[in-house]
From Swiss-Prot:
Classification via InterPro entries: Rbsml_uL18_euk
Keywords tagged on the record: Ribonucleoprotein, Ribosomal protein, RNA-binding, rRNA-binding
GO biological process terms held by the UniProt record: ribosomal large subunit assembly; translation
Cytoplasm recorded as keyword: no
SUPFAM superfamilies (alphabetical): Translational machinery components
Listed GO CC annotations: cytosolic large ribosomal subunit
CDD domains in the record: Ribosomal_L18_L5e
Protein name: Large ribosomal subunit protein uL18
Family that this chain belongs to: Belongs to the universal ribosomal protein uL18 family.
Organism: Methanococcus maripaludis (strain DSM 14266 / JCM 13030 / NBRC 101832 / S2 / LL)
GN (gene name): rpl18
Length: 193
């Protein structure tokens, strides 16, 4: 019943909206490890995966919560956190002598400036070689948090709205206007691991 002239049941992971098998096959045929980047509302995860018959093997992984342990005080789900997570993954990968990969964006749409491409840019800045197009990566101002700084400065006139919007930043002891400098400090710390 699963396959006949009228009806074909797709693979389970495709039905669940988890895997695009055609895209996966194309990535696996490259023979390189895959840089798998995934974003949720509050976190970013990046992994370098290698194919194995029994199941994919994780070579190196990084999570935005690791940034908090390194002293990051910003939000773990924004663009600067995605960039720093990619940078951390790239630094770990270069240490493990994994310098080439292909980006696996999964079922995410390829939107210019998306967090997945911020992870890619971080891995590239750490010294990895990953094929990409330069137009898809966000501007440097967005990767280091200048857009957050500009928004905080524009909101500064309304004290209540400012405190409400940036309460977690202020609670952790970071002024949102200082985010670009904070990102640069952490970038240096990661590259000197």
């Amino acid at each position: 019943m699963a396959m006949n002239a009228k009806f074909r049941v797709p693979f389970r992971r495709r039905r669940e909206g988890k895997t695009d098998f055609r895209q996966r096959l194309g990535l696996l045929l490259s023979g390189k490890p895959r840089l798998v980047a995934r974003k949720s509302l509050n976190n970013v995860t990046a992994q370098l995966m290698a194919y194995d018959e029994k199941g994919d093997v994780v070579l190196v992984s990084a999570h935005s919560k690791e940034l908090v342990k390194m002293g990051y005080k910003g939000h773990c789900g924004n663009l600067p956190a995605a960039y720093l997570t990619g940078l951390l993954l790239g630094a770990k990968a270069v240490k493990e002598d994994v310098k080439e990969a292909v980006l696996d964006k999964g079922l995410h749409r390829a939107t210019k400036g998306a967090a997945i491409f911020a992870v890619l840019k971080g891995a590239l800045d750490a010294g990895m070689d990953i094929p990409h197009g330069d137009k898809i990566i966000a501007d440097e101002e967005r990767l280091n948090g200048t857009h957050v700084k500009n928004y905080a400065e524009s909101l500064k006139e309304d004290a209540d709205a400012y405190k409400k919007q940036f309460s977690k930043y202020l609670e952790k002891g970071l002024n949102p206007e200082d985010l670009p400098e904070h990102v640069e400090e952490l970038k240096e710390k990661i590259l000197n691991l």
